[in-house]
C-alpha cells in the first residue's frame, strides 16, 4: 500500500525563490519570538527588574531572563491583560502569510487602509473594555496605559455601562473593517458550529448515508460536467466555424450562427451584405478575373495593420444578378472597401452594420471595366497625384468632374464612347461635397449623365455599383475651378447656361446689383424633397431641375429688374454720380458681408439702401450748395459695371473672395488735427460706410446737411446749434461743429469707453446721416464744478503739512475719559500650571547638570515672564547661579534668563524666564485700577504691571526726578508717553504744567497745543538751554515766596494761598517793585502749578550745549524738588559722559529698559540685569530709597490713543505760553548763567580778555596758568566772557571759539 502511494506521489524537492526564502525565515523568527514572549508573559514576576522596577537585589524568576522580564513588563504596562493575546495573534499572522504563498493579488490600498483602521479600533476598544470590566493584574491596569486613558476619558461623559456599550459598538465595527466578514455570515457560522456540536453530542448524525449520497452526487456532477463540457466545446468549435465562414461570406456565417441560436439578437442582426441583397443590389457575374486579382493582391497585405481581413476583398459570387447600365465611380465607406467592389463583413457578427445607401434597381448604372484592386491602407505621398478616387466618409457623395479642357473642347452634340468617358473621369479628381447641389444650367443630354450611351456594358461588383449609383444621382458635370484642386466651392449661385463661356458673377456681386438669389439652404431643402423622384428617373430629374430653377431664375431676374429701376430712380432723384456707387460696390468686403439666408440678405440690402439714400441726399445737397445746380446725371444709369463673360468656367472660391480690381486709398481720420490743415474739410470717399462705422460715437446724431468741399479747398462753415450727446454728458455744452476754427490739441476719441460702446443699426444709420463738418473741433471748456482754485494748484501746501486748528467740541467731563484708550481683551489666556510644573522640573534638572542642587518651591506667573523661586541647598552661593545665567538660557532654549539674587522678604533666589505667549499690558487697564484712582497726587504716573500682574503706580512728586535709559526699540518712548498720559488723566493745567524738550522733533511734538504747556515744544537746543535757565530762575523765585510764607514745599504754599483766598484776603507779592510793572498795587499771589520738564533725548542735548546744561540740570536736581519742578530725562546712550556722576547723584529714581551691555546697565542702575531684558516695554524700575530694582512690564500706548487724548485737551482750552522762557531774559538768577545782574566783573577780566584775543584760544586752564589764579576764578572769568559774547559756548569736546576780533583789527 505504501509502495503504491510512493509511486503515485513522487516526493520532489522544489527550490524556493529568494523572496520566499526570506519570507519563511522571517516567519520562523517571528514564531519563535511569539513563543518566547508567551513564556515570558506566563512566567512574569513583579519582583524582577523591568521598566517599572529599577531597584532589584534578588535573582530573576522569569523564564525569559532579564530581557523577557523587561518585555513582559512593557507589554503588561501598555496593553494590560490583552498582552497574553499578542503571541497567539503573531502566530496566526505568520500562518496566514505562509498560506498565501501563491497568491499574487493586486494590492488594494483602500482595503489596506480599512484593515489598518479596523486593527487600531480593535486594539483601543479591547484595552478600554478590559480596563472597565476586568480586575487589575499585579500592579498593572487591566487595560494598560491605553485602556486607562480611554476609560478615564469616557467615564465623565458616560457611566460604566454606557462606556462599555460604546466600546463594544466600536469593537464590532473594527472587527468588520479588519476581517471583512459580515456579521450575518459570522452568525451563520456560529449557528452552524453550535448545531454541529449539538448534533455530534446527541449522536444523531448519519455520516455513512451522507457520504454515500455525496459520492453519488459527485458522480452525477462529473457526468453532467462531461456532457456540459462537450457541449461547450461544440459551441466553441461551431463559433470557430462561424468566424471562419464569416471571412469567406456572410451567408454561411449567418447559417452557422442560426444553427445554435435562432433567437440570439447578436447572430440575427442583418449584415451589410444582407441589406444589399434585400434591396436588389446583388453581386454581378462575370467578374472572376477581377476577383482573382483582388484575392492574390490582398494576400500580401498584413491583416494586423488593418481592421479588414484579406479575404474580405474577395467577391461573393453566390449572390449575383444583372443590374442597370450607368457607369460612375463608387463611394468609399469607413473601411474603404467599397472601392474594390466588396462589402466588408466583420468577424464579430454582433457589431452593428454601417449605414448603406440603397437605390432602386432601375436607377443602377453599369460600368465598362472592373475597378482597380488596391490596398485599404491610407495613401502616402502627394494626395493629388493618386490615380484613384478619394473619399472621406460613407455619408459623402462623390461626383465625377471632368477637367476644364475637356469641357471647353466638347461640343454639345458630340458623343464619345462610354469607356473613354469613364476613363477620363477616373483620371481626374473627385470633388466630394457635403451638400449635393445639382447645377441648374446643365443640359440633360451631356454625356456625363447620359444613360443611353453606356448600355450593354459589363457589370461591376455589387458594392461598387451601389455606391456608384448613389453618387451618380447627384453628380454635376463640370467643375467650377480651372486647376486640379479638389476643394471646390459649389452651390454659391446659379450657373446659367450660355452658348459662350462667360464669367459667372458671385452671389455678392449679384446681390450688390439688387438681384436676390435663393440661398444655399433653400436649395438643399428642395433637393432633399426631390431625392426620391430623382433616384427613380435620373433623366427626368435632370430636366425637372432645369425647369424649376429656370422658373426661379425668371423670378430672380424680374426682381432684379425692379431693383434696377428703383436704383435708377434714386440716382435721378438725388443726382448721385455712379462713380461713387461703383466704388462703394467694389470696396465692400464680400467675406464679411456675405448673406447666408434670404432674411439676412433682405435686411442687409434694406440697410444698405437706406444708407446709400442718405449719402446721396447729403452729397446732392453739397453739390447744389456749391455749384447752384445739380450735376450731370444722364450717364448715372448707364454707367453700371459691365459683367466680364470671358472666363465663365475659370473662377474659383479664392477668386470670389479676392478682388483684384484697383482700389481707391482708404481714408482714415487722424485723431489729431494739424494747424496747417484746420481749414481743409474732409472729403467723403467711396467707403462712407466703413469710415462712419470707424468714427467714434461722439459724432452728433444728426445735423443739417452742409456743403462738402474737396481736400485742398476751403469751405465756408455754418454755425451749428446741435449739441452732441457726449458733450452734454461730460462738459454740459458742446462745441463740436462750431463755426469758429481753432487749432485742436485733443484727440477726437477721448476715452476707450466711447469706442467700445455697442453699435446698433439705428446708431449706424444716424452716424451715416451726420456729415463730417469742415470746422475743426475746439476743446470744450470744463465746468466750474470740476475745476480747482488757482491758488491750490500753484501752492505747495499739503493738507498733511498743515496743523488742524479747527475748533473742536468741548467735552463735558472735567478730565478725559478712558473711552479714548483701547480696551484690553475680554478673555484672558489661562495659565497652564502643568506646563509650568514641567518647566520647574526642567530647571532643576539643568541646574543639576551644573552641579547646583536646588528645588523650585514657588512659581509666580506674569504677563511676560514667570519667576521660579529656588531653594538652594546649604552651602550653595547665589552668585553661582548668577554666573550661569547665559548657560541656563541656552540649555532652557530661552531668550534671556535673569537671576534675582535677593527677593525681599523671602530666603529664595529668583529665576525669571520669559513666557511662550507674551501678553500685552494696556494703559487703560492700569489707569482703571484702584491704586491709581485713589492716589491723590497730581503727579501720579503708571508704569505697567509687575511679574505678578499687579499694576505699578509711582508718584513723580516723591521721586522727585526720573532718569530713563534704553536702546532703540526697547519701549522707552512708549514709556514716556504713558507717563505723560497718566498726568493728563490725573491733573488739570492749574495743577501741572509741562516744558517739553524734544531734540528729535518726533516723540513729544504730538503734544503741541495742549493747555498744560508753559511754552511750545522746544526743538532747538539753544532754546532748551534758555528754558532750563528759566526753570532755575523760577525755582529761586518760588523758594523766596515759600520762605516768605514760611512753608517747606509747594503743597504748603498752595494751601496757604488757598486759605487766604478763602478768608477773602489774598496775599500780595512781597517781592514786587513798582518798577517791575505799570500796576499801582502789587499783584496777589496765586496758586502755583507743578512743573514737569520732559527731555526726550538728553544725550543729544548734552552733546550740543555741553557743560552749561549739566550745571543747570544739577542745580534743578538738587533744589527743585521743594519748588515743585521735576525732571524726566530720557536717553538712548546711558554712558558716563552723558549721565555724569553729578547728575546720577541727584537723580535717585531710574528706569532701565533693555540696554546693550552690562556697562550701560551698571551706569544707569549701578548693577547688572538690564542687558537681559526682553525689550518692548520690559523694564527695571529702581524706586527712590531702594537699591533693588523691580521688574515691570510697561503699558502699551498707541499713537491713535495719544492723538485722541491730545485732541480732547485741545478742545478744552488753548495753552497760555510764557514768552520769557525761550527769550533768555534775565529774570531772577537766570540772566547770566545763574549770576546776579548787578555782579561786578573780575579785576583781571580786561587782562584775561586781551590774553584770549591774542592767543585766540579760550580755556579755563590757560587763564589759570597765565594769571596764577584758582580754577573757580578762571572759570568765572571765562563765563563772563561768554556772557558778553567774547567767546562761544563750549562745544561737544569742551573747546570754545573766540568770537571777538584780534586787538590789532
Curated annotation (Swiss-Prot):
Transmembrane regions: 22-42, 75-95, 110-130, 138-158, 167-187
SUPFAM superfamilies with a match to the protein in the record: beta-sandwich domain of Sec23/24, P-loop containing nucleoside triphosphate hydrolases, Winged helix' DNA-binding domain
The organism's place on the tree of life at top rank: Bacteria
Sequence positions that bind ATP: 969-974
Keyword vocabulary terms for this entry: ATP-binding, Cell cycle, Cell division, Cell inner membrane, Cell membrane, Chromosome partition, DNA-binding, Membrane, Nucleotide-binding, Transmembrane, Transmembrane helix
Keyword Nucleotide-binding found: yes
Biased composition regions of type Polar residues, renumbered to the chain: 535-549, 707-743
Keyword Transmembrane listed: yes
Protein role: Essential cell division protein that coordinates cell division and chromosome segregation. The N-terminus is involved in assembly of the cell-division machinery. The C-terminus functions as a DNA motor that moves dsDNA in an ATP-dependent manner towards the dif recombination site, which is located within the replication terminus region. Translocation stops specifically at Xer-dif sites, where FtsK interacts with the Xer recombinase, allowing activation of chromosome unlinking by recombination. FtsK orienting polar sequences (KOPS) guide the direction of DNA translocation.
Protein's name in the database: DNA translocase FtsK
Native source organism of the sequence: Yersinia pestis
Amino acid at each position: 500500500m505504501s509502495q503504491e502511494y510512493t509511486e503515485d506521489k513522487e516526493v520532489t524537492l522544489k527550490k524556493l525563490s529568494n523572496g520566499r526564502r526570506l519570507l519563511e525565515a522571517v516567519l520562523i523568527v517571528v514564531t519563535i519570538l511569539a513563543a518566547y514572549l508567551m513564556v515570558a508573559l506566563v512566567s512574569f514576576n513583579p519582583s524582577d527588574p523591568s521598566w517599572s522596577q529599577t531597584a532589584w537585589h534578588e535573582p530573576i524568576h522569569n523564564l525569559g531572563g532579564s530581557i523577557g522580564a523587561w518585555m513582559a513588563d512593557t507589554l503588561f504596562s501598555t496593553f494590560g491583560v490583552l498582552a497574553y493575546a499578542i503571541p497567539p495573534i503573531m502566530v496566526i499572522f505568520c500562518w496566514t502569510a505562509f498560506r498565501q504563498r501563491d497568491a499574487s493579488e493586486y494590492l488594494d490600498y483602500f482595503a489596506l487602509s480599512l484593515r489598518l483602521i479596523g486593527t487600531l479600533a480593535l486594539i483601543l476598544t479591547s484595552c478600554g473594555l478590559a480596563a472597565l470590566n476586568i480586575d487589575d493584574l499585579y500592579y498593572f491596569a487591566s487595560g494598560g496605559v491605553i485602556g486607562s486613558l480611554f476609560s478615564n476619558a469616557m467615564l465623565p461623559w458616560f457611566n460604566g455601562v454606557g462606556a462599555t456599550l460604546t466600546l463594544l459598538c466600536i469593537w464590532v465595527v473594527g472587527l468588520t473593517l479588519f476581517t471583512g466578514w459580515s456579521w450575518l455570515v459570522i452568525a451563520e457560522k456560529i449557528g452552524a458550529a453550535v448545531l454541529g456540536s449539538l448534533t455530534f453530542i446527541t449522536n444523531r448524525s448519519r455520516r455513512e448515508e451522507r457520504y454515500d449520497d455525496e459520492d453519488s452526487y459527485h458522480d452525477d456532477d462529473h457526468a453532467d460536467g462531461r456532457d456540459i463540457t462537450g457541449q461547450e466545446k461544440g459551441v466553441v468549435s461551431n463559433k470557430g466555424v462561424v468566424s471562419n465562414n464569416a471571412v469567406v461570406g456572410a451567408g454561411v456565417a449567418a447559417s452557422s450562427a442560426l444553427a445554435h441560436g435562432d433567437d440570439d439578437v447578436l447572430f440575427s442582426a442583418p449584415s451589410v451584405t444582407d441589406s444589399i441583397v434585400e434591396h436588389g443590389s446583388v453581386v454581378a457575374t462575370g467578374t472572376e478575373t477581377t476577383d482573382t486579382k483582388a484575392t492574390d493582391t490582398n494576400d500580401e497585405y498584413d491583416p494586423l495593420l488593418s481592421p479588414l481581413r484579406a479575404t474580405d476583398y474577395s467577391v461573393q459570387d453566390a449572390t449575383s444578378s444583372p443590374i442597370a447600365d450607368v457607369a460612375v465611380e463608387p463611394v468609399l465607406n469607413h473601411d474603404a472597401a467599397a472601392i474594390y467592389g466588396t462589402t466588408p463583413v466583420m468577424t464579430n457578427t454582433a457589431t452593428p452594420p454601417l449605414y448603406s445607401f440603397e437605390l432602386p434597381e432601375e436607377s443602377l448604372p453599369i460600368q465598362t471595366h472592373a475597378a482597380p484592386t488596391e490596398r485599404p491602407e491610407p495613401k502616402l505621398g502627394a494626395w493629388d497625384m493618386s490615380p484613384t478616387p478619394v473619399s472621406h466618409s460613407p455619408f459623402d457623395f462623390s461626383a465625377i468632374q471632368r477637367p476644364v479642357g475637356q469641357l471647353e473642347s466638347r461640343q454639345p452634340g458630340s458623343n464619345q464612347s462610354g469607356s473613354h468617358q469613364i476613363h477620363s473621369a477616373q483620371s481626374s479628381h473627385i470633388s466630394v461635397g457635403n451638400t449635393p447641389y445639382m447645377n441648374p444650367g446643365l443640359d440633360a443630354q451631356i454625356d456625363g449623365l447620359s444613360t443611353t450611351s453606356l448600355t450593354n456594358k459589363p457589370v461591376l461588383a455589387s458594392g461598387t455599383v451601389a455606391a456608384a449609383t448613389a453618387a451618380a444621382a447627384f453628380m454635376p458635370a463640370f467643375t467650377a475651378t480651372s486647376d486640379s484642386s479638389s476643394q471646390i466651392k459649389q452651390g454659391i449661385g446659379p450657373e446659367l447656361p450660355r452658348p459662350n463661356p462667360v464669367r459667372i458673377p458671385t452671389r455678392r456681386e449679384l446681390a450688390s446689383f439688387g438681384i436676390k438669389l435663393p440661398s444655399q439652404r433653400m436649395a438643399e431643402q428642395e433637393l432633399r424633397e426631390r431625392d426620391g423622384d430623382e433616384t427613380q428617373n435620373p433623366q427626368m430629374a435632370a430636366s425637372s431641375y432645369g425647369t424649376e430653377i429656370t422658373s426661379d431664375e425668371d423670378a430672380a431676374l424680374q426682381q432684379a429688374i425692379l431693383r434696377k429701376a428703383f436704383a435708377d430712380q434714386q440716382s435721378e432723384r438725388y443726382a448721385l454720380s455712379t462713380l461713387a456707387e461703383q466704388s462703394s460696390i467694389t470696396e465692400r468686403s464680400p467675406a464679411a458681408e456675405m448673406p447666408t439666408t434670404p432674411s439676412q440678405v433682405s435686411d442687409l440690402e434694406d440697410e444698405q439702401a437706406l444708407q446709400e439714400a442718405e449719402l446721396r441726399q447729403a452729397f446732392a445737397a453739397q453739390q447744389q450748395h456749391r455749384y447752384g445746380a445739380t450735376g450731370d446725371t444722364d450717364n448715372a444709369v448707364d454707367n453700371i459695371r459691365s459683367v466680364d463673360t470671358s472666363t465663365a468656367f475659370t473662377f474659383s472660391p479664392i477668386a470670389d473672395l479676392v478682388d483684384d480690381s484697383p482700389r481707391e486709398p482708404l481714408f482714415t481720420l487722424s485723431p489729431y488735427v494739424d494747424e496747417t490743415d484746420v481749414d481743409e474739410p474732409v472729403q467723403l470717399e467711396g467707403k462712407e460706410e466703413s469710415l462712419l462705422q470707424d468714427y467714434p460715437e461722439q459724432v452728433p446724431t444728426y445735423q443739417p446737411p452742409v456743403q462738402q468741399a474737396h481736400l485742398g479747398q476751403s469751405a465756408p462753415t455754418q454755425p451749428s446749434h446741435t449739441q452732441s450727446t457726449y458733450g452734454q454728458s461730460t462738459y454740459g455744452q458742446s462745441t463740436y461743429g462750431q463755426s469758429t476754427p481753432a487749432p485742436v490739441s485733443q484727440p477726437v476719441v477721448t476715452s476707450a469707453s466711447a469706442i467700445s460702446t455697442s453699435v446698433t443699426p439705428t446708431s449706424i444709420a444716424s452716424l451715416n446721416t451726420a456729415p463730417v463738418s469742415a470746422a475743426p473741433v475746439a476743446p470744450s471748456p470744463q465746468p466750474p464744478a470740476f475745476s480747482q482754485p488757482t491758488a491750490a494748484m500753484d501752492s505747495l501746501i499739503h493738507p498733511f503739512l498743515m496743523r488742524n486748528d479747527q475748533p473742536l467740541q468741548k467735552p463735558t467731563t472735567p478730565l478725559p475719559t478712558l473711552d479714548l484708550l483701547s480696551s484690553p481683551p475680554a478673555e484672558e489666556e489661562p495659565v497652564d500650571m502643568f506646563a509650568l510644573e514641567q518647566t520647574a522640573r526642567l530647571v532643576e534638572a539643568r541646574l543639576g547638570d551644573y552641579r547646583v542642587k536646588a528645588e523650585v518651591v514657588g512659581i509666580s506667573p506674569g504677563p511676560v515672564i514667570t519667576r521660579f523661586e529656588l531653594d538652594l541647598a546649604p552651602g550653595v552661593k547665589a552668585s553661582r547661579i548668577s554666573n550661569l545665567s547665559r548657560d541656563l538660557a541656552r540649555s532652557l532654549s530661552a531668550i534671556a534668563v535673569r537671576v534675582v539674587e535677593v527677593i525681599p522678604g523671602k530666603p529664595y533666589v529668583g529665576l525669571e524666564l520669559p513666557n511662550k505667549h507674551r501678553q500685552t499690558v494696556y494703559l487703560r487697564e492700569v489707569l482703571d485700577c484702584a491704586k491709581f484712582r485713589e492716589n491723590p497726587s497730581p503727579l501720579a504716573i503708571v508704569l505697567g504691571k509687575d511679574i505678578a500682574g499687579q499694576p505699578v503706580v509711582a508718584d513723580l512728586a516723591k521721586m522727585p526726578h526720573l532718569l530713563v535709559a534704553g536702546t532703540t526699540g526697547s519701549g522707552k518712548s512708549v514709556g514716556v508717553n504713558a507717563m505723560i498720559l497718566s498726568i493728563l488723566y490725573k491733573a488739570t493745567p492749574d495743577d501741572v504744567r509741562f516744558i517739553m524738550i524734544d531734540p528729535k522733533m518726533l516723540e513729544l511734538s504730538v503734544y503741541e497745543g495742549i493747555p498744560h504747556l508753559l511754552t511750545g515744544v522746544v526743538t532747538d537746543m539753544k532754546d532748551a538751554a534758555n528754558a532750563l535757565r528759566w526753570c532755575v530762575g523760577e525755582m529761586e523765585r518760588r523758594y523766596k515766596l515759600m520762605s516768605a510764607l514760611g512753608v517747606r514745599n509747594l503743597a504748603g504754599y498752595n494751601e496757604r494761598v488757598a486759605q487766604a483766598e478763602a478768608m477773602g484776603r489774598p496775599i500780595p507779592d512781597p517781592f514786587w517793585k513798582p518798577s517791575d510793572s505799570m500796576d499801582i498795587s502789587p499783584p496777589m499771589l496765586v496758586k502755583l502749578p507743578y512743573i514737569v520738564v520732559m527731555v526726550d533725548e538728553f544725550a543729544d542735548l548734552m552733546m550740543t550745549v555741553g557743560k552749561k546744561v549739566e550745571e543747570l540740570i544739577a542745580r534743578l536736581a538738587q533744589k527743585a524738588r521743594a519748588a515743585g519742578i521735576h525732571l524726566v530725562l530720557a536717553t538712548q546712550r546711558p554712558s558716563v559722559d552723558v549721565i555724569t556722576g553729578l547728575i546720577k547723584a541727584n537723580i535717585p529714581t531710574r528706569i532701565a529698559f533693555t540696554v546693550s551691555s552690562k556697562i550701560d546697565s551698571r551706569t544707569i542702575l549701578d548693577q547688572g540685569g538690564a542687558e537681559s531684558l526682553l525689550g518692548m516695554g520690559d523694564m527695571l524700575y529702581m524706586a527712590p530709597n531702594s537699591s533693588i530694582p523691580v521688574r515691570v512690564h510697561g503699558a502699551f500706548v498707541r499713537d491713535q490713543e495719544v492723538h485722541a487724548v491730545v485732541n480732547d485737551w485741545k478742545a478744552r482750552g488753548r495753552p497760555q505760553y510764557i514768552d520769557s522762557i525761550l527769550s533768555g531774559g534775565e529774570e531772577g538768577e537766570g540772566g547770566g548763567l545763574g549770576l546776579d545782574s548787578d555782579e561786578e566783573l573780575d579785576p583781571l577780566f580786561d587782562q584775561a580778555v586781551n590774553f584770549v584775543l591774542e592767543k585766540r584760544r579760550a580755556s579755563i586752564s590757560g587763564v589759570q596758568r597765565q594769571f596764577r589764579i584758582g580754577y573757580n576764578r578762571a572759570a568765572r572769568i571765562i563765563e563772563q566772557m561768554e556772557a558778553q559774547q567774547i567767546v562761544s559756548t563750549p562745544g561737544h569736546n569742551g573747546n570754545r571759539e573766540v568770537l571777538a576780533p584780534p586787538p590789532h583789527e
